[in-house]
Amino acid sequence: MKAIILAAGLGTRLRPMTENTPKALVQVNQKPLIEYQIEFLKEKGINDIIIIVGYLKEQFDYLKEKYGVRLVFNDKYADYNNFYSLYLVKEELANSYVIDADNYLFKNMFRNDLTRSTYFSVYREDCTNEWFLVYGDDYKVQDIIVDSKAGRILSGVSFWDAPTAEKIVSFIDKAYASGEFVDLYWDNMVKDNIKELDVYVEELEGNSIYEIDSVQDYRKLEEILKNEN
């Protein structure tokens, strides 16, 4: 079991905080966001960790010595969405977590006993243009829709078993060959082909994970953490 952390982006909506710092290295309680993820993974014995870097990539170098992670450079980080980041490490997808680096994890939700492809999901209200999971009592994902409502969303943490990963890689290769991937997120490979995939939902408590997508999100997280202490 391994983990792929997507950390190549510009973090434009977090400016000015990301003018000189990658979003994944923005500090929360005096620790970079990505270090919470790495340490939680290692707590569960998941030590093979690949970080896709791009913007200000040299700032991630210290993580190699501190945690023994692997860094992969996405030289197209300013041109494409995260589809290309996953394309670069597609052969690593089997039996791997895929994690968005802009998530603050309140607790360790990682499991080292997963055997099936899983989207970890929190319930959110008043969402705008969010990706929602549609599933039944068996927790198998039937559809992924983009909507503005309340419900369980893609939360930036997923796990992919080998058979599902093999299919996703074929979808990635097809999209790459077509050249029509500039605006794609890697999750489009799942969303657009969900009827061919066996993917399940792991429901998380609402206070498990928090996406930092803007300065307002960051300030809100600061308030949440202050009230917890």
Curated annotation (Swiss-Prot):
Provide one Gene Ontology biological process annotation: cell wall organization
Q: What is its EC number?
A: 2.7.7.15
Residues crossing the lipid bilayer are none
Q: Which UniProt keywords apply?
A: Cell wall biogenesis/degradation, Nucleotidyltransferase, Teichoic acid biosynthesis, Transferase
Q: Which Pfam families match?
A: NTP_transferase
- Give the note describing cofactor binding and stoichiometry: Kinetic data and structures suggest that the magnesium ion plays a direct role in catalysis.
Q: Which residues form a coiled coil?
A: none
pH-dependence of activity, as noted? Maximally active in neutral and alkaline conditions.
Q: Name one GO molecular function term.
A: nucleotidyltransferase activity
Reactions mediated catalytically: phosphocholine + CTP + H(+) = CDP-choline + diphosphate
Q: Highest taxon of the source?
A: Bacteria
UniProt-listed InterPro entries = CTP-phospocholine_CTT, GlmU-like, NTP_transferase_dom, Nucleotide-diphossugar_trans
Q: How is its activity regulated?
A: Mg(2+) in slight excess of CTP gives maximal activity. Strongly inhibited by Ca(2+) and several other metal ions, such as Cd(2+), Co(2+), Cu(2+), Mn(2+), Ni(2+), Zn(2+) and Fe(2+). Also inhibited by Mg(2+) at high concentrations. CDP-Cho is a competitive inhibitor with respect to CTP, whereas diphosphate is a mixed-type inhibitor with respect to CTP.
For the ligand (CDP-choline), the binding residues are L6, A8, G9, Y80, N82, S85, A101, Y185
Catalytic EC class: transferase
Q: What pathway is this protein a component of?
A: Cell wall biogenesis; teichoic acid biosynthesis; Cell wall biogenesis; lipoteichoic acid biosynthesis
Q: Which cofactor does this sequence's record say it needs?
A: Mg(2+)
Chain positions recorded as Mg(2+) binding sites: D102, E211, D213
Q: Which Cys residues form disulphide pairs? A: none
**Its biological purpose:** Cytidylyltransferase involved in the biosynthesis of the phosphocholine containing cell wall constituents, teichoic acid and lipoteichoic acid, which are essential for cell separation and pathogenesis. Catalyzes the activation of phosphocholine (P-Cho) to CDP-choline (CDP-Cho). Can also use phosphoethanolamine and 2-aminoethylphosphonate, with much lower efficiency. Shows lower activity with dCTP, weak activity with ATP and no activity with GTP, TTP, UTP, dATP, dGTP and dTTP.
Family the entry assigns: Belongs to the LicC/PntC cytidylyltransferase family.
Domain free text: The structures of apo-LicC and the LicC-CDP-choline-Mg(2+) ternary complex show a significant conformational change driven by the multivalent coordination of Mg(2+).
Q: How does it assemble?
A: Monomer. Forms dimers in LicC-CDP-Cho-Mg(2+) crystals, but the monomer is probably the biologically functional unit.
Q: What is this protein called?
A: Choline-phosphate cytidylyltransferase
Q: Which organism is it from?
A: Streptococcus pneumoniae (strain ATCC BAA-255 / R6)
The top of its lineage is: Bacteria, Bacillati, Bacillota, Bacilli, Lactobacillales
